[in-house]
Amino acid sequence: MSSDRATIISPTQLIICVALFIGLFNNYSFFSQVWAIYPPSGDNLLFVGSLFCVLLLFTALLISVFAVGPLLKPALIATLLVSANTGYFMDTYHIVIDDVMLDNMLRTDRAEAFDLLSASQALYFIALGVLPSVAVAFAPVWRTPYLKAARARLGFLCACLFSITALLLLQGSSYASFFREHKSVRFYANPSYAFYSVGRLGAGLFDRATRPYLQIGLDANRAASSTRRKIVVMVVGETLRADHLGINGYERQTSPRLWQSDAISFNNAWSCGTSTAVSVPCMFSFLNHENYDQAEALATDNALDVIQRTGVSVTWLENNSDSKGVALRVPSLDFKHAETNSACDSECRDVGMIDGLAAILEETTEGDLLVVLHQMGNHEPSYYKRYTQEFERFAPTCQTNQLESCSREEIVNAYDNAVLYTDHFLGETIEWLNQLDN
């Protein structure tokens, strides 16, 4: 064999190299979970080694299905870039990349996306995504006739399946226990679970697009009332924990204005999820926590639709990313830009929406009125950006979006300062409403 021939690798070898690289460098979160369950010892080392081989073979199997012919290098590069990005967010924020998280990413606006960027992310992405992708792009690969390449790929797929099966059977009891008792660990397998989540998201989006829209509450009406119009303001918050509100007994008084206003706190309320894409549509849907289905909720009238149909003027004011489908059929105003929000500095503040309330009141002179304010609130991870300087009551604070570089005290202080600002916003809203009463 010539020296030139010896430096050229086969498509199968390139796939194995990429799968090995991902297994070694982009699965820190996965193996952190595994080592927490199986501390290093004789039998555990054997099982974890077997698990690594299964992960490697399954990744190679998954890549082999798509990395065929002219798609070989593009598919490998895409896999490397996806696994690097997935690995960064799992390693840094200790999250899993499921279909809900991907849905959030699709709905993320530019400001939110830039809020997540950091030097550490860039370095991580370059080292574990871009550089190996460049190596793949310039790797010399054998060119073989189509039928011969197809036979080789089929043989490799069969070899992967056989090897995975053999490994599972050799330690059957260990794998049975692992899959039965530690199901959540699979969420950290990179990139296989991310690819699975893409499939689930695609199926969910197709379901939403093809599901017929259902109107409900067509017989809803308002009972006769006094001639005095009713004006209701509803605030949809963002990432505000109930146990960090002074009004709920938190050790710090983070809600002095709510306390002074004699506000009532309904503390037996629960969100359907921890992401905006789930919690906001659920909040306004007629489904409950137990039977909530995203596709059904978005294809059915929500509370705003029914209220509007009864003759109430409904308006949605937006200072977050968007309404996640809730306000598609009611008037909405965007307050994320200085052109519409009078309280913008480094970012547009929630209090700017109060001017919007006054404008809506001037335009809607008759009938009952419901205005929903969707605030930026404590949107993570840049808590220090969510309040102005005069509300930095608790110090020192975390002054970066790289929360892993801050102490818990600094993160909590920045978070609580943002809660204070939300309390200020709510206090200003209540004061505006009180002026209407007067």
Model-derived features: positions:
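Transmembrane and membrane-interface helices of multi-pass
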Residues: 1-188
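A long, amphipathic alpha-helix that forms part
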Residues: 189, 355-358, 398-438
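Membrane-interface anchor segments at the N-terminal boundary of transmembrane helices
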Residues: 41-48, 346, 411-415, 419
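Active-site-proximal alpha/beta segments of enzymes that process anionic O-linked groups
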Residues: 168-235, 239-399
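Short alpha-helical functional segments enriched in proximate histidine and acidic residues
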Residues: 113, 328, 360, 429-432
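Short alpha-helical hairpin
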Residues: 23-36, 207, 390-403
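Catalytic cores of PAPS-dependent sulfotransferases
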Residues: 65-74, 78, 93, 306, ...
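Short, conserved clusters of charged catalytic residues that mark active-site
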Residues: 57, 108, 253, 298-302, ...
